[in-house]
Design a protein with these regions (language model features):
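Hydrophobic core segments of alpha-helical transmembrane domains in multi-pass membrane proteins
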Residues: 13, 66-72, 158-160
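N-terminal signal-anchor/start-transfer transmembrane helix
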Residues: 8-29, 168-170
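Interfacial loop-to-helix junctions that mark the boundaries of transmembrane helices
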Residues: 2, 58-65, 151-157
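Membrane-interface helix-boundary motifs at transmembrane edges
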Residues: 26-37, 147-151, 180-181
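Long, contiguous internal "core" modules enriched in hydrophobic/ aromatic residues
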Residues: 84-182
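Membrane-interface helix-loop-helix modules in multi-pass inner-membrane proteins
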Residues: 34-104, 116-123, 139-144
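Hydrophobic transmembrane alpha-helical segments in integral membrane proteins
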Residues: 1-15, 154-159
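An N-terminus-focused feature that recognizes amino-terminal "leader" regions
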Residues: 3, 22-34, 58-61
Length: 182
């Protein structure tokens, strides 16, 4: 019987969500604010998992991995904020085409958004660091969850992917519902 606790669940959710942030952001098509939303959301889940794990039923490797996920997420967030003036390459082209199309149809022209070409863009690979670090903690949590260990690890990893995919898809869909001009 597998024994799954809240700390493992929160780490699964955070790692899966952060992995799918990399999946959706690696082609440079989603806006910078979406990355901020995802990093904050899943960073808080990683922090919650770390706190619950330390207080309730510590698994040292899981907690160390959770702390590393949290630090990597904060670092990625800081780099993203520092480089925000560069914008996102794929989004720039889409925004310019849509603005021109709306202006042609309605005669309403929006102010052009300017980007700073002297600032480097956020490197999408940085979003992969936290999930890779979290993978170690998920394996440790799966082994700790019960026998058979291989099955418990597989359930933990598949659960992380499922939670991350579903939550990221919902957040992405709702993010674009509230974006003006899309």
């Amino acid at each position: 019987m597998i024994d799954l606790d809240a700390a493992t669940f929160l780490l699964q959710w955070a790692v899966g969500g952060l992995f799918f942030l990399w999946v959706t952001g690696r082609r440079r098509e989603v806006g910078i604010g979406y990355g901020w939303t995802i990093r904050i959301t899943f960073g808080l889940m990683a922090a919650g998992g770390l706190v619950v794990g330390v207080v309730m039923d510590p698994v040292p490797v899981r907690e160390a991995s959770g702390a590393a996920v949290l630090v990597a997420t904060v670092v990625a967030m800081v780099v993203s904020v520092v480089r925000r003036r560069a914008g996102v390459a794929g989004q720039r082209g889409v925004e310019e085409r849509r603005t021109a199309r709306v202006a042609a149809m309605t005669g309403i022209d929006r102010d052009r958004v300017t980007f700073d070409d002297s600032v480097r863009e956020f490197p999408p690979a940085l979003d992969l660091v936290a999930p890779v670090l979290g993978l170690v903690g998920l394996v440790a949590a799966g082994v700790d969850a019960g026998d058979p260990a291989l099955l418990a690890v597989a359930r933990t990893l598949v659960g992380a992917l499922f939670l991350g995919a579903v939550t990221s898809a919902m957040l992405l869909g709702h993010w674009y519902l509230v974006q003006p001009g899309l």
